């Protein structure tokens, strides 16, 4: 066991955290600030995650804070809720149930420090402050033992290295490489959350490089092993938003054998994200952006304004800027070969700005008339025919959005009601894959 190194430091601990520790002390229990907050304060960074370790059992913790909202999601951890924020209070880890034993069973030395509020002292038995100065991520005592306790720590080592700009200590790195397969025993949800934190770091390419170098990536994302540095650099170039970074990760593999264009790429997005239980909404967002980025590769100046409006409608106006940044990130890595695609992208942006001066009709909901007006003009009863006519009108307005006025649409309906109705009915059926003529409401007897 390491020497109990204590260094006196005065820190401004949040009032609620102080009150938690004081109440535990008042009931005769030991209690210390521990983990990430101590690490961040030692580094001169603002601390955001305030955790407490204590000699009290979970039952004793709940008894001390009986009047406070709390819940337990993890073994021997009670989460206290105060003003919408969560604070974890955990019973000492390890068989001896001492502070030193608890710190020995933490993941890395930089996280294996505690703060004694009574003495204003940092307790550092395993050299965490030394490793902060050396800028290394080192497993506590035996990296293999720490990884066996929780294999998610294999990815956490990479994440801390990337987040903090540290390197992984050699013995710890070797342990990761020798134990990569154990990551398969961790729940997909936990892996997902840790991987997202890697992706939204300042340099996600470094995280992906470490995951590939250690051999972890082949167990986590075998579909995305191909691509090397190029894939990571694409992710680096987009804003640190989970949806955008995930989209960039998939788009960057456009030329790989495992990520083909079109339907196959959609299937890959759905398969990978589904495997890690991402929300359906997030899967749809990423799949839509990846599909649109691939479709954008086919953009040409010969596209008509209507073609471009259909593309905008399919992608969604709200996603256009995201799509453009995604496309720019993907083609920039082509080096000299990027000049042509970047010129096309600039021309695309200019055309889009011009077209967007007239609102795009996204569908029947944007028409200047509704179903009641269709039924009145066409003498129809409520039914699917009304919806088909509205959809047909919205399709017509893709080419001519300036026609989206009540007067013009009524005129179009009246024209459809004329002897040319049959022709229009057939065009509606052709567009929407339906058969048969429009059923008109019976004419009143004169």
Model-derived features: positions:
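Catalytic cores of the polymerase beta-like nucleotidyltransferase superfamily
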Residues: 1-446
């Amino acid at each position: 066991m390491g020497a109990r190194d204590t260094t006196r430091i005065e820190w401004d601990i949040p009032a609620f955290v102080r009150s938690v520790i004081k109440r535990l002390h008042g009931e005769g229990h030991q209690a210390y600030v521990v983990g990430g907050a101590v690490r961040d304060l030692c580094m001169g960074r603002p601390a955001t995650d305030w955790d407490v370790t204590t000699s009290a059992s979970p039952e004793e913790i709940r008894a001390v804070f009986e009047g406070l909202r709390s819940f337990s999601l993890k073994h021997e951890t009670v989460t206290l809720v105060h003003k919408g924020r969560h604070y974890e209070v955990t019973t000492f880890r390890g068989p001896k149930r001492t502070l030193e034993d608890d710190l020995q069973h933490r993941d890395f030395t930089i996280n294996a420090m505690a703060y004694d509020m009574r003495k204003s002292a940092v307790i550092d038995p395993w050299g965490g402050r030394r490793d902060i100065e050396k800028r290394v991520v080192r497993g506590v005592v035996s990296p293999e033992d720490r990884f066996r306790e929780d294999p998610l720590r294999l990815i956490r080592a990479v994440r801390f290295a990337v987040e903090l700009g540290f390197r992984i200590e050699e013995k710890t790195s070797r342990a990761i490489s020798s134990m990569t397969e154990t990551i398969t025993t961790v729940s997909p949800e936990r892996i997902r959350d840790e991987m997202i934190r890697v992706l939204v770091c300042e340099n996600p390419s470094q995280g992906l490089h470490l995951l590939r170098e250690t051999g972890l990536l082949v167990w986590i994302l075998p579909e995305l092993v191909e691509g090397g540095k190029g894939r990571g650099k694409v992710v680096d170039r987009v804003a640190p938003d989970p949806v955008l970074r995930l989209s960039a990760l998939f788009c960057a593999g456009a030329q790989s054998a495992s990520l083909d264009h079109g339907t196959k790429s959609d299937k890959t997005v759905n398969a990978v994200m589904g495997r890690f239980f991402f929300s359906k909404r997030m899967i749809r967002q990423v799949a839509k952006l990846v599909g649109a980025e691939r479709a954008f590769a086919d953009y040409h100046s010969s596209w008509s304004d209507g073609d471009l409006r259909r593309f905008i409608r399919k992608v969604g106006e709200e996603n256009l800027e995201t799509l453009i940044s995604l496309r720019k990130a993907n083609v920039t890595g082509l080096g000299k070969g990027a000049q042509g695609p970047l010129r096309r992208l600039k021309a695309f942006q200019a055309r889009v700005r011009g077209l967007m001066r007239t609102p795009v009709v996204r569908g029947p909901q944007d028409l200047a008339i509704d179903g009641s007006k269709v039924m009145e003009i066409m003498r129809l009863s409520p039914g699917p025919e009304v919806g088909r006519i509205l959809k047909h009108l919205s399709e017509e307005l893709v080419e001519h959005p300036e026609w989206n006025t009540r007067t013009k649409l009524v005129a179009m309906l009246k024209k459809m009601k004329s002897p040319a109705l049959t022709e229009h009915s057939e065009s509606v059926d052709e567009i929407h894959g339906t058969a048969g003529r429009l059923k008109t409401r019976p004419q009143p007897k004169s």
